[in-house]
């Protein structure tokens, strides 16, 4: 007899069930997806805390370093924005091909380290360089985070997940203005940079251990 492949309905059904079981095993649980979403939202909050802190501290820095309005404007606006924009595109392309969790972690480490380093600046040029570093680091936060959230959540839940992630903006602004002003008034602007930047450095290292690349 010629060789015949067994294509019986029972075997086909068994294969389909096995495939579904493998797919379910590979799909993260609902609780883990929510957990990752909270972790990435906290990263986004740190992004905006570090971004807003200079706005809060600018008057103290202006007096301490004897800066002109044009120097202050460059420090708080253009220097950050131009590097944030130009670095964002290549980092997003990198995220399409690389490990997105590691990119988020590295970006968080860079901008947090540069924020803390701002507290050591002895002149305008050093502070400007540190803020440029913050801009480059923060450019790598959102693109890979959006991509990870899109992979973790099915299409029907993605809009809600991304909306939750966006609350990190307002959480960061709220904490930045509330805590930053008090710290600056109590301890000075240099300490404020340290206290805002250092937690992000440790959080960046922790992120590698607590989040899986989807």
Language-model segments: which ranges?
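Cytoplasmic helix-loop-helix junction between adjacent transmembrane helices
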Residues: 130-170
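Membrane-interface helix termini in secondary transporters
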Residues: 60, 89-93, 182
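Helix-loop-helix hairpin linking two adjacent transmembrane segments in secondary transporters
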Residues: 165, 169-213
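Extracellular/periplasmic helix-loop-helix junction of adjacent transmembrane segments
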Residues: 55-86
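Helix-breaking motifs and short loop linkers at transmembrane-helix boundaries and internal kinks
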Residues: 66, 99, 120-126, 137, ...
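Residue-level signature of mid-helix packing/kink "hotspots" within the transmembrane helices
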Residues: 52, 80-89, 139, 173-174
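Cytosolic juxtamembrane N-terminal segment immediately preceding the first transmembrane helix
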Residues: 5-49
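Conserved MFS/SLC helix-loop-helix module at the cytosolic interface between two early adjacent transmembrane helices
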Residues: 86-125
């Amino acid at each position: 007899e010629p060789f015949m492949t067994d294509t019986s309905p029972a075997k086909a059904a068994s294969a389909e069930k096995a495939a579904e079981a493998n797919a379910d095993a590979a799909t993260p649980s609902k609780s883990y997806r929510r957990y990752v979403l909270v972790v990435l939202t906290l990263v986004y909050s740190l992004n905006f805390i570090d971004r807003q802190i200079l706005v809060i501290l600018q008057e103290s820095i202006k007096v301490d370093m004897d800066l002109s309005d044009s120097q202050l404007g460059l420090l708080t606006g253009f220097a950050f924005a131009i590097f944030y924009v130009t670095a964002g595109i290549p980092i997003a392309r990198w995220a399409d091909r690389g490990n997105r969790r590691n990119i988020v972690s590295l970006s968080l480490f860079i901008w947090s380290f540069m924020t803390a380093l701002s507290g050591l600046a002895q002149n305008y040029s050093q502070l400007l360089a540190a803020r440029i570093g913050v801009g480059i680091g923060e450019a790598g936060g959102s693109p890979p985070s959006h991509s990870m959230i899109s992979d973790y959540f099915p299409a029907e839940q993605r809009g809600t997940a991304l909306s939750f992630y966006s609350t990190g903006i307002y959480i960061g602004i709220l904490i930045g203005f509330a805590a930053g002003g008090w710290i600056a008034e109590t301890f000075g602007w240099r300490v404020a940079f340290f206290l805002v930047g250092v937690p992000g450095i440790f959080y960046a290292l922790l992120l590698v251990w607590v989040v899986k690349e989807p």
